[in-house]
A protein has these predicted regions:
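Hydrophobic alpha/beta core scaffold segments
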Residues: 570-574
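Glycine/threonine-rich ATP-lid/beta-loop region of ATP-binding domains
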Residues: 555-558, 562
Length: 701
């Protein structure tokens, strides 16, 4: 065991806490933020991977940047507020890890994406590369489609410094009157509401398409915005603001009003990052740095002046040979009945486990709520809503149900970051038709994915439930891989009824004998399940833990896993994102293996298996639910995890976990040195997601 001094650990949602690690804990601990950068490196690796279709590679460059934006808004914002030497050192270390990734991203775009797209007839050009005819065409496009949306500004004593919104890109110029040496700054915001890639047709060979970035077209026509003035070279700058605004709930003020005030305040939060394109004017850099009270560590000089999130626009060009083969989610065989109301009798005949996006979200979860809204036997519908999107069929179904006189209750999480305004809107729409809308439990976010339908049947009232690992969001249901359970088993439905009483009323704690509910029982129950595996191993009984989740960070859970490993319990962890546990450390985690699976779908499901003394995995315990093993999930959120009680559904989960553990195409393995290595199989080796697609096709044939 190392004799190192206790270390500071980056833990939790709201800052770098002075949590002291013991020497043993420090030996197996990986910093959360460093591990997150490793995760985003794995995303970038998909763009660098020759096996990935070309437009998908462009999409992964965009995902890499989008992820990084959120990382800065949430995590780097916290670190920048830190005052200790350790926190400042971590900022420097994170920056040093990030800079080579940014160079890799730029090299991939410039040396791979652009020339390879050209080979396939997609020409990406800069303004200076255009022919005179193309520049004239772009100028006409600018006059008709861009200029009316622009607001050219100057900064001088008569014009105050303009507001720069979060994640906005701006072009900054030196502006002079002809014959004068004095200059002022001019600023033009690049609008996000317009197409970010301008298509041109002049001098383009037949069968090819040519695009120019929007900011290049603006830059090439900027003189029209400042007619009669002299413009210097443009500096492209992109700004990121702090989004980690922690609201302390005021019991004397309504939560809705507090959230609305928080949304307004977020626009004006401190700037935490400035990104500059190549050749940025040094005076502009220094002016902005001083204006926003930043240090040199907060400025990033990028190798390429492109905002890579704009590549999402190109990634969906209709060129099938450059994209993943289209996947249309299939109707689960158990739900292959054209009568919408038949879903309730189908659930009565047995629990159903659906796996999205392989199996249809519309034909299962949406259908469940839609049928309940239209069914005259439905008495009530209750749902949690964390992220539900813009054009949500779920709210439409709830509105229709309320208009039909059914009792409708929705626990709307209006503190879901970046979805607050959307959720406030849907809350108002539901209240308008008389639905009961509550905002959950004071001080907690409601993150569980649960729906309850109560019907009047011959024998009395019967409850039906959906519990999932993913949001009630039709868009992400096509992009995220998640599980959901449909059941009318009273062992589960009774708990869900009590859970909603807790969420909508003032019960101190729901009576839940089957479900694991955070922050009330989940942490304790999970620790008990791990302890049981330790006891079984010591008693000579079969013991094993397989846990799949998005991230692992909670210190209690990591400590319990270390104790299980030390007792000889084999542990397999499938963790897509950051993992704060280092496997394979002698005396601590030598029986723990960690892998991460990255692919076309975001692996979002949380699945837990405990052998429970049984040699046959199908006789062990299985759970699915909404919670990762993070401090915030187990202590600061309402989360729901359900056991899977039916043998056939356990088999489906075990088959999936087994596929994940055997994957040598999409998997990365975490070593005892804290670094990930990508497995490299034969070229025709299938990964987890393609294997599940094939199995899903077989199941309906």
């Amino acid at each position: 065991m190392s004799a190192a001094a206790p270390a500071l650990v980056s833990i939790g949602d709201h800052g770098v806490l002075n949590a002291q690690l013991t020497p043993a804990q420090a030996d197996v601990w990986i910093d959360r933020d460093m591990s997150w950068l490793d995760f985003n490196q794995r995303v970038l690796a998909e763009a660098l991977d020759e096996r990935t279709p070309l437009l998908e590679r462009a999409k992964f460059l965009a995902i890499f940047s989008s992820n990084l934006d959120e990382f800065f808004m949430k995590r780097m914002a916290i670190l920048q507020q830190g005052q200790t030497k350790e926190e400042r050192s971590l900022l420097q270390t994170l920056r040093e890890r990030l800079l080579p990734q940014l160079q890799q991203q730029a090299d991939c775009y410039r040396n791979i994406i652009v020339p390879r797209l050209e080979e396939h007839g997609i020409l990406l050009r800069r303004w200076d590369d255009l022919t005179p005819a193309q520049q004239e065409e772009a100028g006409l496009y600018f006059d008709a489609n861009i200029s009316p949306a622009l607001t050219p500004l100057v900064i001088d004593p008569a014009h105050p410094f303009p507001f720069l919104s979060n994640l906005s890109s701006s072009l900054v110029f030196e502006l002079r009157h002809p014959g004068h040496t004095e200059f002022m700054y001019a600023r033009v915001k690049v609008p996000t509401v317009l197409k970010q890639w301008v298509p041109l047709e002049h001098d383009v060979p037949a069968g090819k398409k040519l695009f120019v970035p929007l900011y290049e077209v603006i830059c090439g026509n900027a003189s029209k915005l400042y007619n009669g003035m002299e413009l210097g070279p443009a500096t492209l700058v992109r700004l990121t603001r702090d989004a980690e605004v922690e609201m302390e709930e005021d019991p004397d003020e309504g939560l809705r009003e507090q959230v609305q005030a928080q949304i307004r305040q977020r626009r004006y939060e401190p700037v935490i990052r400035l990104e500059f394109g190549p050749g940025a004017d040094l005076a502009v850099r220094e002016t902005l740095r001083e204006r926003f009270k930043l240090t040199p560590l907060d400025l990033y000089d990028l190798p390429e002046d492109l905002d890579y999130t704009t590549l999402f626009e190109l990634a969906f060009l209709p060129i099938p040979e450059l994209r993943d083969a289209a996947w249309v989610p299939l109707v689960p065989p158990a739900l292959d009945d054209e009568d919408p109301a038949a879903i309730f009798s189908i659930i009565q005949s047995g629990d159903i486990l659906v796996h999205h996006p392989y199996e249809s979200f519309d034909a299962s979860v949406e259908r469940f709520i839609r049928a309940a809204a239209d069914d005259p036997q439905t008495v009530s519908i209750k749902m949690t809503a964390y992220r539900i999107g813009d054009d949500t069929p779920f709210v439409k179904s709830l509105i229709r149900a309320a208009e039909h006189g059914k009792q409708v209750a929705c626990v709307m999480e209006i503190k879901a970051r970046f979805d607050e305004e959307r959720n406030l809107h849907w809350a108002a729409e539901l209240e308008r038709v008389g639905a009961h809308v509550t905002f959950g439990v004071s001080g907690l976010k409601t993150h569980g994915k649960t729906a309850l339908v109560v019907r009047k049947e011959a024998g009395g009232l019967r409850s039906y439930v959906h519990i999932g690992t993913g949001n009630y969001h039709v868009k992400t249901a096509r992009l995220y891989a998640d599980f959901g359970l449909l059941t009318c088993n009273p062992l589960i439905t009774r708990d869900v009824v009590n859970l909603f009483h807790y969420l909508t009323g003032h019960a101190t704690a729901p009576q839940c004998s089957t479900l694991l509910v955070a922050p009330l029982t989940m942490r304790l129950r999970l620790l008990e399940l791990i302890k049981r595996e330790i006891e079984n191993k010591r008693a000579g009984l079969p013991a094993r833990i397989v846990a799949k989740m998005n991230q692992l960070e909670d210190l209690d859970m990591i400590q319990a896993l270390c104790e299980a490993s030390a007792a000889g319990v084999p542990i397999d962890l499938i963790i897509r994102g950051f993992c704060c546990l280092k496997p394979g450390v002698a005396g601590h985690t030598e029986n723990i293996r960690v892998r991460s699976i990255i692919g076309r779908f975001l692996e979002h499901s949380r699945v837990f298996h405990f052998a429970n003394g049984k040699e046959n995995p199908l006789e062990g315990d299985f759970f699915i639910g909404s919670a990762d093993w993070m401090f915030r999930n187990l202590s600061k959120r309402v989360e729901v995890v359900t056991p899977i009680l039916v043998a056939g559904l356990k088999e489906k989960l075990w088959q999936f976990l087994d596929i994940c553990l055997k994957d040598s195409r999409q998997a990365w393995v975490l070593g005892s040195d804290g670094t990930y290595k990508q497995l490299r199989p034969a070229p025709d080796q299938l990964g987890t997601q393609q294997t599940v697609m094939n199995l899903t096709l077989e199941s309906v044939q």
